[in-house]
Amino acid sequence: MGKSLLRKTKDGKILHWNVEIDDSLCTLQEAFQQVDPNVGFNVELKFDDHIVYEQDYLIRVIQAILKIVFEFAENRPIIFSTFQPDAALLIRKLQSTYPVFFLTNGGTEIFYDVRRNSLEEAVKVCLEGGLQGIVSEVKGVFRNPGAVTKIKESKLSLLTYGRLNNVAEAVYMQHLMGIDGVIVDLVQEITEAVYDMIKPAKVVEKEDNKSLNGEGEDGEVKTKPQFSQRELSFLLKLIPELIQH
């Protein structure tokens, strides 16, 4: 039998995690040892949103994680990410092997630490600490699409997460905006749907000329959304208004 699992509710209560089959959580070391080494890891460092952490504590936690990473990661692709600004800066300061991304709600939720409250502040954190990029809640990007250009001009990568990323059209719009990647739940479904939107349109014609002169079955035409620069600019102005409601 594995150890009993506990879960923490949003109001801070600790409850037993009741499931059909109980098992213990694997350690980071076990994940490195048992998962295909070709599978990349996003090692997210999670901290309590409402605690102000001392730097010594953050250093101890991060050094313990880095010890496991450097011992067992081998050639596995890895990025680090965290919502905690000081932790993000320390991860980068303590190692330069793996990219570090700063997670942000992009202003969709307000925190005591102002560095967490906007994409503009996220850029400042990244530039201050030499981080590689930002991972934003997708609504934060749609509410402030102008920030994408500023982020790219700062030579930072931009990824997004959030429920809207399970909508193919929302992901396709981000492709048009120049966003570098998305975190999704429905990986295969979204990948296939967006691929169909991105790939060039195809016309399937009959070998004979019946489809050309109107006789017989018409050729099948697969289309993708087409936007002029003016239309795209209009959509980018409209999206923030839609997201507010």
Language model regions located:
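C-terminal active-site rim and adjoining tail of enzyme catalytic domains
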Residues: F101-H245
